[in-house]
Structures are given as C-alpha cells and as structure tokens.
Amino acid sequence: MTPKTTDERVRFGVIGLNHEHIYGMVRMLQTAGAELVSFYAPEPELAAPFAERFPAARQTTTQAEILEDPTIHLITSAAIPDERAALGIAALQHDKDFLSDKPGFTTLDQLAEARRVQADTGKFYAVFYSERFENAATVRAGELVKAGAIGRPLQTIGLGPHRLRPTTRSNWFFDAPRFGGIINDIAAHQMDQFLFFTGSQHAEIVAAQVGNLAHPQWPGFEDFGDVLLRGDGGTGYLRVDWFTPDGLGSWGDTRLTVIGTEGYIEVRKNIDIAGRPGANHLFLVDGHETRVIDSAQIELPFGRLFLADIVARTETAMTQAHSFLASELALRAQATAQRIGSEWS
C-alpha cells in the first residue's frame, strides 16, 4: 500500500527484533515523521523491552496481522538474517515496502527471488546500510566527494572491526549459514560505500578470503574476512573482523578512506584513537592543506528521503539497483572466498 497523498503519514510495522539495530531504524523513521503502528516478535525477552521503549505500538500475536493490515505502508525488520528475505518478499507481495537491517539476504538464491518479486510488484526492498546512512562524517564525506573536493575518486578502503562480546550473542550468531558469513554480514556496509563513493554501477570480486582464526570453540563462526574488488568507477579494498580489544572505547574503530586524483578523505567513524574525543572524525587532504572537518551539524537525510520515496515512488534515498548490488557483491565475495587460517594453527 502507498500513501494516497503527500500529506498522509507513512505508517509502518516491525517484524523481527533479533538485532538491536532495529531500535535505530525505528528511531530514524519516527524522527523523519513515520508512525510505528505495530510489531511482532516471537521471543518474549525481545518483545518486552521493545514494548517498553515504544509503548504506543501494538504488539501482535502473529506476523500475518501486520502483513495483512491494509493501513500499513512499510515493514521494517531485524529478524535473524536467514529469515529476512522470505519476510521481505512476503511484504512486497502484500503491497508493502520493506526496509531490512543488513544483511538483507544470506544466499544468492534469496536475492534472485527478491529481485524477481520486486520487479513484479514495484515495491521497495531496501537494505539499511547504517554505516553510511547513520554516520554524519560519512554523509559529509559524500557531499565533499560529490563537490569535487578530492578530484575523481579512485579507490575506497573500508575497515569494519567489531567487538565480539560473546556472552551477549544468540546461538545463531555463531552459525555462518544463519548470518551468511562474515563478509556478507558485516562487509555489506563497505560494499555500499564502495559503490556510492566511486559511482560504480557494475563491479566484480577480484579476490576474497575468510577464516576462523582464533575461535575454534565455534567451528561454524568466521572472525576475519577481506576483499579486493574492481568497479567501473574505481577499485576497493575492505577488511572486517571480530578482533576489537576491550581496551578500545568503542565497539569498533571503523574507518573509510576515499582516494582521489587530487586528494583523499579519511573518516574515523566511531573513535579517533588517542586523539580527539567522540565520534564522526573527518579529515581531508588536498593540494593546499590538511583539514579536520566538523560534521556535527550535518543532517542524516536517509529517513526523510526514504519516506518521500515511499509516497512519490522515487528513488532519492537509494536506488533499488544500488541496494541489491551492494548485497550481491557481499554475497558473491562470501561465496568465492578462499578459506584461510587452518595452516596457522
């Protein structure tokens, strides 16, 4: 269902609370003006804190109640990753747009079916690449690159280290088929940023590798992955891992470097180690100087643009092709990755 006029408020439901990203997604949609109507989660321990945080939302006893509600325009989800595609496809088939936490898929077959249904229905299947959409320094970096601040972009380097915190994780977290592997799970962010900053419309995986280098107690887990890729707008390298030490004052020292013909930009998203306090650190080096750029007042426009797209059926927040391609690259890199580490034990 699509809002009938631009004045009609976008109404959305939530199905699946298995990752805490859902709280940020809901907050983003509400801040942009959408109304949370209802939610469903089969796990009482997940439903209770969500209901307390969003008391105006009605808790349903089945997900079908949300899918079949004709007043709901959008469904958003942070379900277990291998369950997201089936839910998203069902949402589209019920005439609703869908916003998924990343990863939006765990297999290439799921992606192919989602593409088919999306083409048939014309509804949005969007993946929420929060490292770009919800990070002010990265948004500002995009504005600078678009304005030509570093010339023509040549390469992105994306680093996505994370802290493991194993006692806070559910069993599915350590089972690669359930989350699609480390490249598919985490590096979907870096694939999105590679496409966005280089302007690539097509890309290929040059090399990829994954491994469980230090956690033999979870044989189905992967704690390291990296990828080299090439697009029609530039090249990219990315590394993701679960080795952030407890001594760091953040869950991960995630970084983005964009190299251009006339300079480069580095974004230290969460922390500037032993440097400036806080997050959202943006550095620009060009032919004249080195600058630290303040991004504190930068608007995060994704929510506003996405809701406008739902109403107008435009693609200003992110194109459908981009959403799918970033996921496809992560899936293809995961599927073709060489497994490493056993020779080091």
Predicted regions and their residues:
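Beta-loop-alpha module in the N-terminal Rossmann-like domain of NAD(P)-dependent dehydrogenases
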Residues: 43, 54-117
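Mid-domain beta-loop-alpha active-site segment that forms a flexible
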Residues: 128-136, 167-203, 220-223, 322-323
